[in-house]
Amino acid sequence: MAKKLLVMAGGTGGHVFPAIAVARELQKQGWEIRWLGTKDRMEADLVPKHGIPIEFIQISGLKGKGIGALLKAPFAIFKAVMQARKIIKNYQPDAVLGMGGYVSGPGGIAAKLCGVPVILHEQNAVAGLTNVWLSKIACRVLQAFPTAFPNAEVVGNPVREDLAQLEAPEIRFAERGYPINILVMGGSQGARVINQTVPEVAKQLGNNVFISHQVGKGNLGGVEEIYQATGNGIAAEFIDDMAQAYSWADLVICRSGALTVCEIAAAGLPAIFVPYQHKDRQQYLNATYLADGGAAIIIEQQDFTPQTLLNVLQPLIADRRKLTEMAVKARAKATPTAAQRVAEVIIEQAK
């Protein structure tokens, strides 16, 4: 009889995509997978598209909520735990994998109540609040970066297989000349500061670069017109084939979410990171994983002006060898076996 895994992950691609990579790895080994999520977040559409059945509980975050919501929170959490417990009782999983998002909290508590082993994976350099709580009841805690939990095994972030299969950067870059291909990602929601600043710099860089700019939903206005005028770039709300985009690129300018940092390492690309300004400096610390190894440059959001970006870009554009060196250093920081290692731990811990 096939072993069963319940995956708890939701809210953002940074939680969902690594969890899908682990699910794929276990499916290859004959495991049955089911997902626990919430109806109003991205997993509701994304997970079924990958052929994985999903069950829903009702839960939302408490950050920024009013006093009324905080007073009701214990009842909402209790209700969500009971919903998750019912799903677990019916499904009878051999293990539960928590990959972050609000859904992991009630799901993890319910799994513990049902005597099902809980394995956690923290994607960021700073542990999320839900994972900090769940780490006290989990049988194993894994992490992408060495800074989230002091004694947890570092496995990296599971990324899509097609990224790890890209040719080594020194081979990809060997015959390239000009223009320098720059991939710009404002994130799925779009990062206004990146979307405003990069096109302004494009005006000054001329034919030395060609820019492929993912602006995020509803953010094409203004950006597209600038690239049409300069003739050295294109803009799109989304890029469907990220493996092809990474293969094409010589340099990436983007935020430094955990998954993005690990994808860039897997692809072997130099990066300019503009960390989102979390209170806990989460994205900044993610970015240091590559920046400290000489594979990336960090520009803080308040410093990300057209002139600062131009000053950083010009020496890189003038020296292809430097770009190749940074790309090789990025690839050296990759963890291509992360999904396999998480799957191994789940198999070890399954009841």
Curated annotation (Swiss-Prot):
GO terms for cellular component: plasma membrane. The lineage of its organism: Bacteria, Pseudomonadati, Pseudomonadota, Gammaproteobacteria, Pasteurellales. Belongs to the glycosyltransferase 28 family. MurG subfamily. The keyword RNA-binding does not apply. This is UDP-N-acetylglucosamine--N-acetylmuramyl-(pentapeptide) pyrophosphoryl-undecaprenol N-acetylglucosamine transferase. Its main location: membrane. The keyword Metal-binding does not apply. Its EC number is 2.4.1.227.
